[in-house]
Amino acid sequence: LMSVCMSLCCNGFQTATSKLVAEKPQNRQTILICAIIMSATIALLLTIIMYSNANYISLCILSEPRCTELVKALSFSILPAAIHSCINGYYYGLKKAAVPAATQLIEQTARIGSCYLIYAILSDGGSCFKPVYSIYGIVAGEASATVFSVITIKKDFSYFKISAKSLKTTAYGMAALFIPLSLNYILASFSSSVENVLIPRTLKLYGLSPALALDIFGTISGLTLPVLLFPGVLCSCACVMLLPSVSEANAAGKDTK
């Protein structure tokens, strides 16, 4: 569910921002502002839809009524994720990968630390760790990453002025890249989401209880699949780092480079 939302408002904009900034570094501020406005608008709509339809999503899509609270909490992570994804794309386009790397480190640290703090504060004696605590951790991690990204990029906008005409022109160029990229990400995420929904359902048809089916699915998705897909992560990282160089060479007409 989260991957589909990220495909709609984050991944496509991050890649488009990286490409456009690499091609036109002189217009980088306008490109980023345009990306954030468009991405944040979609993210806000998704947040409203997810929160208001959390019960339907839990019952009809996830087939687990206990996920209602989780879906509502998770909806608040979409907007900050969209904002710092655009900023990450901005720095990738400038070939400054240190900032996105630091952002991810801060996000993971805040996520784990906030989970521990929330459990320590809200747990009643020896009560078990509730799944919603991990969702609160995701929200805290995304918010922390966004705050760090905004503080870091603030210096690049000290003497910047934007015009409606340049913003409109950039929006058309952004849309031309964002739409096909997002469709590609959506198809991939949708396929993955269908798989994630079908695995627990199939396990329940096999005879397992809903709790045990989710337990086994958590083991598969959290332990097994990351190990199997690790080589693909390396290829994805290489693609992210190569995109600005390819875009810059293409804009300069250096096709052989």
Model-based region annotation:
Residues 81-103:
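Membrane-interface junctions at transmembrane-helix termini in multi-pass inner-membrane proteins
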Residues 27-41, 171, 175, 221, ...:
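Interfacial transmembrane-helix starts/ends
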Residues 64-86:
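Alpha-helical transmembrane segments of multi-pass membrane proteins
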Residues 64, 93-94, 128:
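Helix-loop interface residues and adjacent transmembrane-helix termini in multi-pass membrane transporters
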Residues 10-25, 229-253:
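Helix-loop junctions and terminal segments of transmembrane helices
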Residues 45-68:
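Short membrane-interface helical motifs at transmembrane helix boundaries
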Residues 138-141, 145, 149, 153, ...:
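Transmembrane helical elements of multi-pass membrane transporters/channels
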Residues 103-117, 125-155:
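Hydrophobic alpha-helical transmembrane segments
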